Amino acid sequence: MSHDADDKTYPYRKDDAELRRRLTPLQYEVTQHAATERAFTGEYTDKEDDGIYKCVVCDTPLFESGAKFHSGCGWPSYFKPLNGEVIDEKIDYSHGMVRVEVRCNHCGAHLGHVFEDGPRDKTGLRYCINSAALNFESRPEND
């Protein structure tokens, strides 16, 4: 699923050549062509440090570590984004399924998907996010 046919315009304009230079091949494929990293291989799947997870493309803060939980799915999981304005959701019909794709609302980078099987005592949602789409910024006490 490529973003090439999308009609939404995002505030941050990405230069493809610059992205190819700056991102790893996996980061590029995940964020620009909606690829999925293999389960249990991502850098942030088991990370428990206190901090903020940001978009690897535009550095927009997306998720707080306090919203992260162990879902057992093999990808970092969060029960809510930082706020309601940082995430764009779009119906995804790829691979013979109907899912809700999650993108950065600032640059349109593919992040992952959101499912309704998260912690019931929180939001009931599970934002299943590719580590390759994220950068982590630890809070000063973790340095």
Swiss-Prot record:
One of its GO terms (cellular component) is cytoplasm. Its EC number is 1.8.4.12. GO terms for biological process: protein repair; response to oxidative stress. Binds 1 zinc ion per subunit. The zinc ion is important for the structural integrity of the protein. The active site is at 128 (nucleophile). Disulfide bonds: none annotated. Pfam families: SelR. Its cofactor is Zn(2+). Keywords: Metal-binding, Oxidoreductase, Zinc. Residues 16-139 form the MsrB domain. One of its GO terms (molecular function) is peptide-methionine (R)-S-oxide reductase activity. It catalyses: L-methionyl-[protein] + [thioredoxin]-disulfide + H2O = L-methionyl-(R)-S-oxide-[protein] + [thioredoxin]-dithiol. Zn(2+) binds at residues 55, 58, 104, 107. Gene3D superfamilies: Peptide methionine sulfoxide reductase (2.170.150.20). InterPro entries: Met_Sox_Rdtase_MsrB (IPR028427), Met_Sox_Rdtase_MsrB_dom (IPR002579), Mss4-like_sf (IPR011057). Belongs to the MsrB Met sulfoxide reductase family. PANTHER family: METHIONINE SULFOXIDE REDUCTASE, METHIONINE-R-SULFOXIDE REDUCTASE B1. HAMAP family: MsrB. This is Peptide methionine sulfoxide reductase MsrB. The lineage of its organism: Bacteria, Pseudomonadati, Pseudomonadota, Betaproteobacteria, Burkholderiales.
